[in-house]
């Protein structure tokens, strides 16, 4: 394939793709029978990589009811949203306790909203499910109660904490198909993903491999997850970090966590730690200080970080995977819930960059938008849904925001480029970068090529041509 007259790093160039790689860049002659994409001066970028996503949860979301802000903001709205025709299990997502005046509903409360069918309502964090009585009855009929099922005396409240594996087993769940999610990511110009689910194991790895082999998952894939992932055959995916998901209210035993980190390091795997509170970050830094850091060890989210903790991250040589769009999606809630003295510590960007930390961007979808262009725009604006600014001094330039999604997924300190020999993972915009940088809009993506294969082209144009005159010499 010849991509003709594209803007590559500010220069008008032709780019030839052969097989899975970029073969040549420059002013190139068309070969007989060679397909052509007319770029017309549009910016050609390396394909974007989402460095933190939960693909199975994103796929499951498509058959779920949204039950949290901004769509649902109060208990009456929650009750209305849950009035879905049908029978059998009702899966609802996105709940936040602000909807119910700061209280987590129990089974009896949910029974008043959904009395006739089993309901499971997921908290926005992804770490908690709220079950009505019918759901409790069905689940406990096939599986013994797990430790994470809250009870008051002899009564189960229906609040289930950190028990996704138990829930999936009790429900007899099978991994979802990724085709629709993958096509949507391709529309955004995403050619690679790192799935950060801490429960990833050899079983789910086989599903990823099958989806890749069948062409249903178009993006190159890195899988983080459990220690057992190191023993899984790497077919269609590459092994990523060991994932540790901390929760401030129930931190693990320090020595047990230390042994976990050392076991991962012994596999040659970096550690990726979920840190959304200051306490979780302090715990992580102490853990890696004791274990000794490995190149590539990384902090996910870095939601709250004082300058002192940032300095410790630098001293340990850590990387950071950030979600700038959380400010644009939830910023007003942060301003209400987080103590004012910590507002400046929320979702830092420029401070991390200036300190020398390698940064990458991840959507955390479905817990945030999967559109990386929204995250880029949020990194530049730092504004909440209501228009308030959070840490405007932490804003990035459009180029710095874009760079979050151009990092090498196995080495966040390296930026991928368009160069001969590099993988043919490409994102072509319909306009030059000078115009696109002021918009940062996924609607500007005209063509996406993943591993040399056209996986998206916008419906309002037909960029592929086969020029008849090239089939015979002049």
Could you describe each region identified by the protein language model?
Residues 93, 122, 195-196, 220-226, ...:
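A cross-family glycoside hydrolase active-site/sugar-binding cleft signature
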Residues 262-272, 279-297, 301-302, 307, ...:
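His/Asp/Glu-enriched, well-ordered alpha-helical/loop segment
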Residues 209-240, 311, 442, 451:
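Extended hydrophobic/aromatic segments used for targeting, binding, or gating
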Residues 88, 115-117, 190-191, 215-221, ...:
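Short, well-ordered coil/turn segments that N-cap beta-strands
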Residues 54, 236-247, 318-328:
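Non-cysteine beta-strand/loop elements that form the S-adenosyl-L-methionine
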Residues 23-24, 446-447, 456:
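A structural microfeature
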Residues 2-217, 228, 244-262, 267-276, ...:
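Divalent metal-binding segments
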Residues 457-471:
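Glycine- and charge-enriched low-complexity intrinsically disordered segments
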């Amino acid at each position: 394939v010849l991509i003709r007259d594209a803007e590559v790093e500010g220069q008008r160039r032709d780019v030839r793709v052969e097989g899975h790689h970029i073969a040549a860049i420059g002013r190139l002659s068309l070969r007989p029978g060679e397909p052509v994409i007319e770029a017309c001066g549009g910016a050609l970028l390396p394909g974007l990589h989402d460095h933190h996503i939960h693909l199975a949860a994103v796929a499951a979301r498509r058959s779920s009811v949204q039950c949290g802000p901004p769509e649902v903001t109060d208990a009456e709205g929650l009750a209305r949203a849950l009035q879905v025709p049908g029978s059998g299990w009702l899966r609802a997502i996105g709940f936040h306790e602000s909807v119910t005046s700061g209280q987590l509903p129990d089974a009896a409360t949910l029974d008043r909203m959904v009395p006739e069918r089993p309901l499971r309502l997921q908290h926005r964090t992804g770490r908690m499910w709220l079950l009505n009585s019918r759901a409790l009855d069905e689940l406990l009929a096939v599986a013994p109660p797990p430790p994470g099922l809250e009870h008051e005396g002899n009564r189960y409240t229906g609040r289930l904490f950190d028990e996704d594996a138990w829930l999936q087993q009790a429900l007899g769940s099978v991994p979802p198909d990724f085709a629709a999610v993958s096509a949507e990511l391709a529309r955004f110009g995403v050619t690679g993903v790192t799935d950060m689910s801490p429960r990833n194991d050899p079983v789910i790895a086989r599903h990823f491999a099958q989806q890749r082999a069948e062409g249903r998952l178009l993006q190159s894939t890195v899988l983080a997850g459990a220690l057992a992932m190191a023993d899984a055959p790497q077919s269609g995916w590459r092994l990523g970090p060991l994932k540790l998901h901390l929760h401030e209210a129930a931190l693990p035993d320090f020595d047990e966590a230390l042994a976990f980190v050392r076991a991962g390091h012994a596999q040659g795997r970096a550690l990726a730690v979920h840190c959304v509170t200051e306490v979780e970050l302090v715990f992580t830094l102490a853990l890696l200080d004791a274990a000794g850091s490995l190149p590539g060890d990384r902090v996910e989210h870095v939601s709250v970080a004082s300058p002192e903790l940032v300095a410790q991250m630098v001293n340990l040589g850590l990387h950071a995977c950030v979600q700038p769009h959380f400010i644009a999606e939830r910023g007003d809630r942060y301003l209400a819930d987080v103590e004012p003295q910590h507002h400046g510590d929320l979702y830092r960007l420029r401070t991390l960059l200036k300190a020398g930390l390698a940064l990458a961007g991840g959507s955390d979808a479905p817990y945030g938008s999967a559109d990386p262009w929204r995250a880029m725009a949020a990194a530049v604006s730092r504004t909440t849904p209501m228009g308030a600014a959070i840490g405007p001094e932490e804003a990035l330039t459009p180029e710095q925001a874009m760079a979050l999604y151009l990092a090498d997924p196995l080495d966040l300190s390296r930026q991928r480029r368009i160069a001969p020999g590099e993988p043919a993972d490409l994102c072509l915009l319909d306009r030059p970068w000078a115009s696109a940088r002021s918009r940062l809009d996924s609607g500007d993506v005209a063509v996406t090529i993943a591993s040399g294969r056209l996986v998206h082209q916008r419906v309002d144009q037909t960029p592929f041509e086969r020029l008849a005159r090239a089939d015979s010499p002049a």
